[in-house]
């Protein structure tokens, strides 16, 4: 993408406030044209002094122009600042909404921290360009087009000096653009590496400290910063050289104008005031050319990060599901996989030609070794991924023919990783159903065996749980995740190793609750305990992405195949969790209401 196209696309993000943008730009253009009158008025003042004529009228007009210019500039700058900040936050929010709606594979390919880095840096760069566009760029371009004809009208011989100066600025800018293009792209790459390392180290701070990796991680960061500086310095050198050359050219131009002006004054072909006016024109033009040079510098330095952002934006639009898709309604829970295949990009892993049928209210246990495709199967049902071949239907309706939002309303999932937000316990559970009452939420927590431990917290349901639930134990996190799914009360329940982090006693209590809520509800369970598999209506045995065996527990045992060998090898936990009945002093629900 060329520099001009990059710049033009940045400006398209102002379209939603087109009228306000045009008003500010128009006012700034008028201001730029008015500014041109100042050197002319100054020249008249000088002539009035030299000729000893009345100076007060001209001086008064000049002062009024100056005051009006200052006031107008303040008002325009205020309007531009407010508009840019509004658009910056709006673009950030709109892009964020599209990014978090993208399929999981999209995030896995790009990296969550990388997408965040691209978004934040690009939005900041766009805000700077918008502000400069409304304050300077457009008015500078207009001023240059107006300045040159006026200058030629005043004195064509002196104007040639200004034209030569403008050509020199353009040539220097083109040279620097050509010399720094690849270097700036490399700088952006090193920026990503640096940000990725910082994000990776901080997110794994417990490992860094546990393995005494602080010095090593800091050393790696130093290496990234050194690489960044090595790439950045040549780019900075070229722009420093350009700045020096521009300054030299402008100084020589002013000297030439003064020398030529003095020559023409001595010959009586110009008045002193006209020379002074022309010097003012020259200085005004130099300031505008400097602004154009800074604009080119800014756009070039931002081009790489903006192009990454545009590529990311384009991918979100391409992956956006069609509008006006119907909703999945009145779900009963009959599910069919029809020859479903999904292969991960750049990998041989996935699931292949999977077909099975689940009747309404049945419980399905998915069994298999690590990497067999169990979680992938569940993710396809939720449309986190979409099948490469085949299709999945719920109640006879292809799930790709309905919108994702309605599909996911029909599913309640408890992941192996609890997936908690840095918010209160109440907020984390209410994600299941934001319209639920406090009483419904507390009841869901009781069913998930979470209510008792929550009441022991200082702020009870208003307790902040930290990033990724860092203030909770593994079992507590899992119980909140289960409570969230219970509260959602969806017709299809998915348990991805939902009790893996629970102790035996708590697991027994939660298992009873899950058995209760899964009654007459289609349930998928990634199973590791024999008791879960034995009680399932349908057992699916997966291996290397293939459905090797399916049937009831007794059918697969009688078959004596891979599932039977798995049992004999002890790969499924045989123990049945039990619970001892004991009296507990449970705090009443009404006492849990936050003050």
UniProtKB/Swiss-Prot annotation:
The keyword Cell membrane applies. It is a multi-pass membrane protein. One of its GO terms (molecular function) is ABC-type beta-glucan transporter activity. Its EC number is 7.5.2.3. It is an enzyme of class 7 (translocase). It catalyses: [(1->2)-beta-D-glucosyl](n)(in) + ATP + H2O = [(1->2)-beta-D-glucosyl](n)(out) + ADP + phosphate + H(+). It holds the Pfam family ABC_membrane. The chain crosses the membrane at residues 22-42, 55-75, 129-149, 152-172, 248-268. Keywords: ATP-binding, Cell inner membrane, Cell membrane, Membrane, Nucleotide-binding, Sugar transport, Translocase, Transmembrane, Transmembrane helix, Transport. Its main location: membrane. Residues 335-569 form the ABC transporter domain. CDD domains: ABC_6TM_NdvA_beta-glucan_exporter_like. One of its GO terms (cellular component) is plasma membrane. ATP binds at residues 368-375. Residues 21-301 form the ABC transmembrane type-1 domain. The keyword Membrane applies. It is found in: Cell inner membrane. Homodimer. In NdvA the ATP-binding domain (NBD) and the transmembrane domain (TMD) are fused. Involved in beta-(1-->2)glucan export. Transmembrane domains (TMD) form a pore in the inner membrane and the ATP-binding domain (NBD) is responsible for energy generation. Belongs to the ABC transporter superfamily. Beta-(1-->2)glucan exporter (TC 3.A.1.108.1) family. This is Beta-(1-->2)glucan export ATP-binding/permease protein NdvA. It comes from Bartonella henselae (strain ATCC 49882 / DSM 28221 / CCUG 30454 / Houston 1) (Rochalimaea henselae).
